[in-house]
């Protein structure tokens, strides 16, 4: 494979035709460093783990989805807005495109879950979820409903800290992702996105109880995360699928 494209705080390739728009709000990034060999079998054929300083990472990302829109139409205020928590890995394809691979995506609106599973072929799951804010503290809870294993979930509380004026290389590596990879019939599919540079804050992890990582095929990931970040969010545009 060619070397990965450079890490950039904004998209290296503009999205020329908008297929979906989304707002990502109150985003928490929890990440654990892991051996690339441990997660390589979980990635789509035609991709390999993306690595920084010899390690790849597993992410647990709770946030609020806001007003999904289709083909430039205004975002949907109810069906397009919901809580979400995803488990993701970091990937590179044969074109050097860096991306993420979702192992699971919990959401508390059933219709978007069904649509994403059918249209985008993404592993969305229906869950009971809450997001609560109390000053600089945010708490995210999730309990899976369908499909199983039922009851897999998470309880995460963080305290938001100071703004990062210059994010370090690890923060850029974990957040500046300009597409996702998923399996396809003829090799990996790449779904590009574009958004402004992330406004990132330090964050302190106050509570973490979760079983989503093990349910996503990552039973060996445990302990305190190596990185805890927060962002108030960005507005995102997705282009058409690419090969």
Describe the function of each predicted region.
Residues 10, 15, 73-77, 81-83, ...:
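Active-site-adjacent core segments of small-molecule enzymes
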Residues 50-54, 72, 82, 111-112, ...:
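Short, surface-exposed linear patches
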Residues 27, 86-243:
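Internal, well-folded beta-alpha domain core
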Residues 57-107:
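Extended, compositionally biased
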Residues 1-71, 201, 206, 213, ...:
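Hydrophobic, proline/glycine-rich low-complexity stretches
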Residues 3-8, 76-90, 131-136:
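Short, surface-exposed, charge-dense and proline/glycine-enriched linear segments
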């Amino acid at each position: 494979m060619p070397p990965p494209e450079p890490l950039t705080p904004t998209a290296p390739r503009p999205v020329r035709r908008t297929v979906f728009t989304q707002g990502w709000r109150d985003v928490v990034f929890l990440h654990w460093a892991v051996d690339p060999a441990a997660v390589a079998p979980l990635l789509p054929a035609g991709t390999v783990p993306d690595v920084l300083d010899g390690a790849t990472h597993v992410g647990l990302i709770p946030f609020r989805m806001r007003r999904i829109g289709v083909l430039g139409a205004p975002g949907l205020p109810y069906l397009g807005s919901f809580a979400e928590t995803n488990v993701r890995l970091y990937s590179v394809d044969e074109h050097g495109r860096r991306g993420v691979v979702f192992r699971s995506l919990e959401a508390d609106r059933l219709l978007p879950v069904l649509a994403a599973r059918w249209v985008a072929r993404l592993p969305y799951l229906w869950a009971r979820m809450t997001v609560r804010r109390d000053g600089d503290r945010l708490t995210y809870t999730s309990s899976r409903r369908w499909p199983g294993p039922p009851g897999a979930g998470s309880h995460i509380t963080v305290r938001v800290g100071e703004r990062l004026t210059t994010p370090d290389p690890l923060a850029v590596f974990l957040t500046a992702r300009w597409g996702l990879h998923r399996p396809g019939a003829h090799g990996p599919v790449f779904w590009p996105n574009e958004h402004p540079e992330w406004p990132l804050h330090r964050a302190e992890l106050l509570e973490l109880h979760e079983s989503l990582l093990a349910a996503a095929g990552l039973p060996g990931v445990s302990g305190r995360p190596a990185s805890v970040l927060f962002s108030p969010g960005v507005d995102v545009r997705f282009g058409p699928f690419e090969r």
